[in-house]
Amino acid sequence: MLEGFEPGLSGFVHVDFNNIDQVKNQIDENTAGILIETVQGEGGINPAEKSYLIELNQIAKDNDLLLFFDEVQCGVGRTGKFLAVEWVKNLNPNIVSIAKGIGGGFPIGALLLDSK
């Protein structure tokens, strides 16, 4: 799914969507965080499995990693809740990106951050 979106930034590792084992195998002492598009919008509407998001949350907590949810396409009420991740209880992302739902057609985005 990277074709057409290259070159990528150095230092980022991509894993298959909803594959928690691949995530676990990529974490090392240089890992700063986990970035995921919670509902992938290219090639259809593909939400992350709830169990996957719960495990990502725990991995981030256990390894003191930042958890970053990209909700540019699905945030701000587009799934029936303010954020798509609100459909899963007790998720605590450190960063959430939002955009399309706040702009009303105007190109604007925002980051929601916690104190970490």
Residue ranges, per PLM feature:
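Conserved N-terminal phosphate-binding loop of PLP-dependent enzymes in the Aspartate aminotransferase
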Residues: M1-K116
